Amino acid sequence: MEKDIKIYIDSTRYEVEASLFSGESDEDELLQIIENAAAPEPEKMEIKTLGRLVSDSFKTEISYDETEITGMQGSSTVIFFDKKDIGTVTMMRTGQVSTALVFEKGQRHHCVYSTPYMPFEVCVHTLDIKNHLDGEGTLDIDYIVEIRGARAERTKFSMRISE
């Protein structure tokens, strides 16, 4: 099945005092650091855009073009997952900004985030993921991302799709 869709994304980002690269923090320790942090006001972003849904019996893929709002204009994003493992979601960006981020609850993944200026090593730790894209048309990911040498951020990403 292939069809055009409407995509609604809500994203909230918080700065946190944690290092994912050290590999020393377990999930309980990370959650305690996050909960006890006195973070400044979160940064919120809402995006409404058009995209494409491609789904077969093996995988589901949602694609859309990034906008000026995200600061990644000129890039395209594809979010996909294997239907046998809906708890692992991959987000690939190509264009001005490119990366492949893997989200899997309780897991830490290292990735490269390429910008027009230079590539950065990124570590992503997924706290929670609720993937209902094939049913209710929603995807919620709660994760921490850290660019090596920079402050970590917790992001709560929520996507809703409709026809």
What is the predicted role of each segment?
Residues 92-137:
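Acidic, glycine-rich flexible loop segments
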Residues 1-53:
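Charge-rich, low-complexity N-terminal segments
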Residues 8-17, 65-67, 125, 142-144:
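Generic short beta-strand segments
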Residues 130-163:
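Mixed-charge, glycine-accented linear interaction segment located at domain edges/termini
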Residues 1-6, 56-63, 88-89, 108, ...:
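Short, hydrophobic/aromatic-rich segments at coil-to-beta transitions
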Residues 53-57, 82-85, 114-117, 134, ...:
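A short, structured loop/turn motif at beta-sheet edges
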Residues 26-29, 81-84, 156-163:
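A short, surface-exposed beta-strand/turn
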